[in-house]
Each structure stands twice: as structure tokens, then as C-alpha cells.
């Protein structure tokens, strides 16, 4: 008996656009119209959030890799809800002593939905270093010395 199920069930074949981004000190694989639970953000429900620290973007024909981040790339997220993760129990015990300590922790999370992944192909008009040197030389020439 052979299985007719296609391999690579992890990657979505209908949507070839994805990005790997860094937020909350972790890296996430983001795809459009999917929900993700990340560490608690200071935002209200239905707020829009933009992530600029994008490490990789792949669309249908090409892959962009940042060094370390991709310039002019962004991911737009919408806050869906705030929630708490399941409780983690931490139990510490010292053998042969009557010392035991049981603690619990629940991580605060924010559920977000990815609205769009985009990269803009903009070229700089002029480098900021040359503009800064022009301004500094012109301001020195216009001031009279005492």
C-alpha cells in the first residue's frame, strides 16, 4: 500500500511567500494570514504592528537574505488577543535535606495575525554622508570669525 499524500506538508504550496523575522529575542517563520503567539507586546487589540528586523524573505521566484537584516523590508501584524500560556511547574529539591520548593510560571503572550510581508525596492537619491559634509562646509563659510 502506497500513500498518495504529497510530501512537504510543512510548507504551504498555495502561498509561497514567507519571511523569517526576529521579535521578542526569538526568530519566527511568518506566513501571511496565519496566527502566531509571541511574547507580550505593549499594544491593544486590533492595533497594527510593524516588524523591521527581517532576516530572510522568500517569494515565488527569489530569496532575499539580510546581513543581518534586510533593508526596506517589513511585516505588518495585527494584534488579535492577549492571553497566558499554560503553567510550567518548577520543582527544586535538595536530597537528604527537608528543603523543597515548588513554583509555577505562566508566560504572558500576544496572539498576532500576519497581514502582509513586503520589501520595497527603493534606491537612495544621494548618500547622507555627502549631504552632511556639504551642510557643514557651507555653515562654516557663512559664519564670520571674530
From Swiss-Prot:
GO terms for cellular component: cytoplasm; ribonucleoprotein complex; ribosome. GO terms for molecular function: rRNA binding; structural constituent of ribosome. InterPro entries: bL21-like, bL21-like_sf, Ribosomal_bL21, Ribosomal_bL21_CS. Keywords: Ribonucleoprotein, Ribosomal protein, RNA-binding, rRNA-binding. Pfam families: Ribosomal_L21p (PF00829). Residues 115-146 have a biased composition (Low complexity). The keyword Ribonucleoprotein applies. Residues 95-104 have a biased composition (Basic residues). SUPFAM superfamilies: L21p-like. It comes from the Bacteria. Disulfide bonds: none annotated. Coiled coil: none annotated. Part of the 50S ribosomal subunit. Contacts protein L20. This protein binds to 23S rRNA in the presence of protein L20. HAMAP family: Ribosomal_bL21. PANTHER family: 50S RIBOSOMAL PROTEIN L21, LARGE RIBOSOMAL SUBUNIT PROTEIN BL21M. Belongs to the bacterial ribosomal protein bL21 family. This is Large ribosomal subunit protein bL21. It comes from Prochlorococcus marinus (strain MIT 9515). The gene is rplU.
Amino acid at each position: 500500500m502506497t500513500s498518495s499524500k504529497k510530501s512537504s506538508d510543512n510548507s504551504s504550496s498555495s502561498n509561497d511567500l514567507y519571511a523569517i523575522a526576529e521579535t521578542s529575542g526569538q526568530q519566527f517563520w511568518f506566513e501571511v494570514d496565519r496566527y502566531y503567539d509571541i511574547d507580550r507586546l505593549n499594544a491593544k487589540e486590533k492595533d497594527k504592528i510593524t516588524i523591521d528586523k527581517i532576516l530572510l524573505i522568500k517569494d515565488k521566484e527569489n530569496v532575499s537574505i539580510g546581513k543581518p537584516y534586510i533593508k526596506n523590508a517589513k511585516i505588518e501584524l495585527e494584534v488579535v488577543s492577549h492571553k497566558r500560556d499554560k503553567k510550567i511547574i518548577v520543582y527544586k529539591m535538595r536530597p537528604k535535606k527537608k528543603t523543597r520548593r515548588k513554583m509555577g510560571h505562566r508566560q504572558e503572550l500576544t496572539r498576532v495575525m500576519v497581514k502582509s510581508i513586503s520589501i520595497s525596492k527603493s534606491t537612495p537619491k544621494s548618500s547622507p554622508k555627502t549631504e552632511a559634509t556639504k551642510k557643514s562646509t557651507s555653515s562654516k563659510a557663512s559664519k564670520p570669525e571674530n
